[in-house]
Design a protein with these regions (language model features):
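Short active-site loop/helix that positions an aromatic residue
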Residues: 76-86
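Extended catalytic/binding region for NAD+/ADP-ribose chemistry, centered on the ART fold
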Residues: 69-74
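Long, compositionally biased stretches
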Residues: 1-67, 87-93, 97-167
Length: 168
């Protein structure tokens, strides 16, 4: 499938790379088909590019590697539409709100996107747990939690060191 996007130009997306969100995303119910694109910054960031509305794309991450305390329960009826009741079949993503200052980057922990890895069907859940919100700080500046890591900066083929803390 060829899609002419506003952000990435023309994409040739194989059918096995299409994620179908059964009810779309909140506020974008008509947009149900997406694909994941690696971000130039690198992991853990990815772009969730809409195939139905080429100007629509969101930055997402798998929260597991960076937010180890993020756990929630799913009722079988919540994921019935994606045709699984096996936790191992599920991949979770959360939407990222990027900012100029890395300490202002947030993630929506209240609305995770849950995808069945086997058939690429997904749903966006709305969690009612008060400990999760739509603007959870992804990074903090608390020294006791600092983690040093390197990111390849593809534009210049060099490596930069970034010192951040994983919110915990």
């Amino acid at each position: 499938m060829k899609v002419n996007t506003t952000r990435f130009g023309t994409l040739d997306v194989p059918e096995d790379q299409v994620i179908t969100l059964m009810d779309g995303l909140l506020g974008f119910g008509e947009s149900t088909r997406f694909t994941l694109i690696a971000d130039e910054v690198g992991e853990p960031f990815k772009w969730m590019q809409c195939l139905d509305q080429p100007s629509l794309a969101f930055v997402v991450i798998d929260p597991a590697p960076v937010l180890s305390e993020y756990h929630f329960s799913v009722k079988k009826e919540q994921i019935k539409a994606i045709e699984t009741d096996q936790v191992d079949d599920l991949q979770v993503y959360v939407v990222v709100t990027m900012a100029a200052d890395i300490l202002d980057v947030t993630v929506n922990l209240q609305g995770p996107i849950v995808v069945n890895k086997k058939n690429r069907l997904g749903v966006q859940l709305v969690l009612s747990d008060p400990k999760y919100n739509t603007r959870h700080a992804l990074f903090t500046n608390q020294p006791e939690n600092e983690v040093e890591f390197t990111e390849a900066i593809k534009q210049e083929n060099r490596v930069a060191s970034m010192r951040v803390a994983i919110a915990g």
